[in-house]
Swiss-Prot record:
Species assigned in the record: Rattus norvegicus (Rat)
Family affiliation: Belongs to the PF07175/osteoregulin family.
Protein name per Swiss-Prot or TrEMBL: Matrix extracellular phosphoglycoprotein
Major location category of this protein: secreted
Biased composition (Low complexity): 422-435
Length: 435
């Protein structure tokens, strides 16, 4: 629009006023409406200065002004409308400049309308279906909270006692699961879980004639190491010792809940053999699960006296003869062997039928020869010197200087004699202590 209006304006100027171009004054002022309308005054001045044809120039200027006004009115109007359109576009782009031009009353009315629109918008948001979605969620949550207490009462332990008060899930018709494939029922007087069949679940046989008992230490008030009571159970669902007949070697085993210990009691009176008859009534069931060893009685003194020679006769080269007491070592017997032989030789001068008569004398001589050492080698050397004088003479006659080096069989014979003498001394020491 602006380019069209400017083109029309220039065409009208060139067609309506050709004389203005001749003067040169309007050549630099083309395209300016206000300068073209105001320029007649300097033109009049120029005409007066020249002094030539001044009234003619004035008439011509008036005519030209009238024609200019007639021809310029339309393009000027179109130009004004273009500027107004351009200003409207600027107002849309920059609202702050528009507010500065708008009067205060109009501005207040606009604010009031905006406030009302905001209020209506808030009301629509409150009543909108998108906002109303929160209300059914709240209702659902409250409805879910009403069922929470029932779900919280479900037992976490499957093997615990199932009380009918806590089962609020609607599955009371199904008995609680114990974890091992057996259904349990609740006995309110005991407070524990008992088998559905009292007779079948009373006792499970363990290794023949033994009985197994399930005992709750919290109800009885007994410790884990104490034997629970066998009578007085309420409900009759627990096994007692008197229900089943027990054999001679039977033992009761009780499994205590809450502990890993097994307490048991054995009737020694009913055990086969002599051990059952030797147990006192006070010592029965006193071990509380511990193992007691009952050793046989010590043999009589006649057996000790008669058995000592049998032991000495059967003792080998490397075997140690066992005494009846079993407490004294062989080294202690060797250290005291000399004193024992002296006392026995004084007490029992006629003893020694099973042995040679020179054995005791050899011990006395060995004490004189080996006074500094009581070891096994010293005693063996003493036996070699004094045990067989006839053999020593023969060996000296045969070999001469080689008599000291004897073969091994002779050494074995000497050690056997020494062992027999030591065993006899140990047997005699046991006899003396027994007397």
């Amino acid at each position: 629009m602006q380019a069209v209006s400017v083109g029309l304006f220039l065409f009208s100027m060139t067609w309506a006023a050709p004389k203005l171009n001749e003067d040169g004054s309007s050549g630099g002022n083309q395209g300016n409406i206000h300068l073209a309308s105001v320029k007649p005054e300097p033109m009049v001045g120029k005409g007066t200065e020249g002094g030539r044809d001044a009234p003619l120039h004035l008439l011509d200027q008036n005519r030209q002004g009238a024609t200019l006004l007639r021809n310029i009115t339309q393009p000027v109007k179109s130009l004004v409308t273009g500027t107004e359109v351009q200003s409207d576009r600027n107002k849309e782009k920059k609202p702050q400049s528009v507010l500065s031009v708008i009067p205060t009353d109009v501005h207040n009315t606009n604010d009031y309308s905006e406030d009302t629109e905001n209020q209506q918008r808030d009301l629509l948001l409150q009543n909108s279906p998108g906002q109303s979605k929160h209300t059914p969620r709240a209702r659902r949550s409250t409805h879910y909270l009403t069922h929470l207490p029932q779900i919280r009462k479900i037992l976490s332990d499957f093997e615990d006692s199932a009380s009918p008060d806590l089962l609020v899930r609607g599955d009371n018709d199904v008995p609680p699961f114990s974890g091992d494939g057996q259904h349990f029922m609740h006995t309110p007087d005991r407070g524990g879980a008992v088998g559905s069949d009292p007779e079948s679940s009373a006792g499970h046989p363990v290794s023949g004639s033994s009985n197994v008992e399930i005992v709750d230490p919290h109800t009885n008030g007994l410790g884990s190491n104490e034997i629970p009571g066998r009578e007085g159970h309420i409900g009759g669902a627990y096994a007692t010792r008197g229900k089943t007949a027990q054999g001679a070697g039977s033992a009761d085993v009780s499994l205590v809940e809450g502990s890993n210990e097994i307490t048991g009691s054995t009737k020694f009176r009913e055990l086969p053999g002599k051990e059952g008859n030797r147990v006192d009534a006070s010592s029965q069931n006193a071990h509380q699960g511990k193992v007691e060893f009952h050793y046989p009685q010590a043999p009589s003194k006649e057996k000790v006296k008669g058995g000592s020679r049998e032991h000495t006769g059967k003792a080998g080269y490397n075997e140690i003869p066992k005494s009846s007491k079993g407490g004294a070592s062989k080294d202690a017997e060797e250290s005291k062997g000399n004193q024992v032989t002296l006392t026995e030789s004084q007490r029992f001068p006629g003893k020694g039928k099973g042995q040679s008569s020179h054995s005791l004398g050899n011990e006395v001589k060995s004490e004189e020869d080996s006074s500094n050492s009581l070891s096994r080698e010293g005693i063996a050397i003493a036996h070699r010197r004094t045990s067989h004088p006839t053999r020593n003479r023969g060996m000296s006659q045969r070999r001469g200087s080689w008599a000291s080096r004897r073969p091994h069989p002779h050494r074995r014979v000497s050690t056997r004699q020494r062992d027999s003498s030591e065993s006899s001394s140990s047997g005699s020491s046991s006899e003396s202590s027994g007397d």
